[in-house]
């Protein structure tokens, strides 16, 4: 059963009050960064500066894909340096490959499943040395992998799936979630939710099936509906999904009910050039998502590190209330 629920607007409280401790976990979601690199890298730099400055208040950073615009060595080197700064600040992070990060050569967006450039600059050999490393689907790349996080008294498992994950990748992810019933699960992926707050289902032109990715292997690629049906719906401990990719308004929110009755809170956030009202490649907007087991709330705020202000719209700052966190782990 899929349903869009009313989201209650929250006046923008200060992030400084969201220090992670006890029963509170604070994660930052970095939406598509691609157009910063070709238009205004200084705005992206402001995001990294802000993350480093607030490192003691952040449990992890999740980037939702399209790190680059053209999948070029220059862009990848820039992103590698940026995430090295985040890592050196002691902040756990994960990244996923978007359609602009995959392709036969720079500027060919997911025409084939070639992630060589991404994995050259974000190699598994480096990433698996991190204390929060979980595992990789193929044991060779960061195409599909998971990490483990401990925040306060909560254990988290974060699945990171590439643009248009294959059936094999979903089968692997299904097995990983299945053997960790004691952890709250978040999915971080690129293409999942549409801007009308519905799942990608093969009918919209942003769907992974509209690209060449996977065709050279004759393999199935999955959109949001496929990921939901084959993976997320099946597990009680899945609580949230973060994604990007889609333009128009660039935002969407959906709450779906899993097989075991658990609510899954799914959020699309994208501010890149091409999104309605976008300026400066995205104006440095990022999402601050706080899971508060004490108040039973998920608090979402959207903050511009460039403007040093929260987004003025209620569609970007809201709360999910009456979240029974304990129910996910029974």
Can you describe what each PLM-predicted range is?
Residues 17-75, 205-208:
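N-terminal active-site segment of His-dependent metallophosphoesterases
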Residues 22, 170, 180-238:
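Active-site-proximal segments of metal-dependent phosphoesterases and phosphodiesterases across multiple
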Residues 23-26, 56-61, 88-94, 151-157, ...:
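Loop/turn elements at helix/coil->beta-strand transitions in domains of secreted/extracellular proteins
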Residues 29-31, 59-66, 92-99, 161, ...:
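Active-site neighborhood of phospho(di)ester-bond hydrolases with catalytic His/Asp-centered motifs
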Residues 36-38, 69-72, 97-106, 142-145, ...:
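Active-site environment of divalent metal-dependent phosphoester hydrolases
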Residues 73-172, 178-181, 210, 251-272, ...:
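Extended active-site neighborhood of metal-dependent phosphoesterases/phosphodiesterases
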Residues 211-212, 216-293:
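Conserved beta-sheet core of the metallophosphoesterase superfamily
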Residues 279-330:
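A short C-terminal boundary segment appended to hydrolase-like catalytic domains
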